[in-house]
Amino acid sequence: MSVADIKKSVEQKMQRSIEAFKNDLAKIRTGRAHTGLLDHVQVDYYGSMVPISQVANLTLVDARTIGVQPWEKTMVAKVEKAIREADLGLNPATSGDLIRVPMPPLTEERRRELTKVVKSEGETAKVAVRNLRRDANEQLKKLVKDKEISEDDERRASDDVQKLTDKHVAEIDKLVQAKDAEIMTV
């Protein structure tokens, strides 16, 4: 494995860590409605668990309400039950074959709890990025040990990996700040 391969690999893995972090952030509820909030809700569809998006159409009714329209009338009760049991603090209301999911306003205490969760998720993502840096540096040291590259090349590559790490950690910090601001906005 060459130095370029190691750098390319670590950058791709760091980018995947950022994407996973963004997905985790999307699941954290703010005061506003967005359909991504229900993405991980699983519905019992004739004996197998499937994502809600495979059995219903998700739309925004207004800024604080998600509309869920199951494609089969028989699924309305199951979809409503799945949303209620998803531990998101949501209380869906059914009218006909449309399920309305209003977003309750967040209390000040709940907002503070959520910002702590966001910061914790951010730290976890940073640790993942730093672990990738460590793995890349170990691979570079192995190349030096095997006499495939010089120590100067290893030092330069190590500096490049550090710059990638700094860039991705800064991106995580930016995402955390943005999510905190979104949560604290009343």
Curated annotation (Swiss-Prot):
Matching Gene3D superfamilies: 3.30.1360.40, Ribosome-recycling factor
Superkingdom as given in the UniProt entry: Bacteria
UniProt xrefs under InterPro entries: Ribosome_recyc_fac, Ribosome_recyc_fac_dom, RRF_sf
GO MF annotation: an example: ribosomal large subunit binding
One GO process term, biological-process aspect: cytoplasmic translational termination
One GO term describing the cellular component: cytosol
Pfam families attached to this UniProt entry: RRF
UniProt subcellular location: Cytoplasm
Protein keywords: Cytoplasm, Protein biosynthesis
PANTHER family: MITOCHONDRIAL RIBOSOME RECYCLING FACTOR PSEUDO 1, RIBOSOME RECYCLING FACTOR
Physiological role: Responsible for the release of ribosomes from messenger RNA at the termination of protein biosynthesis. May increase the efficiency of translation by recycling ribosomes from one round of translation to another.
Family: Belongs to the RRF family.
Protein name, as recorded: Ribosome-recycling factor
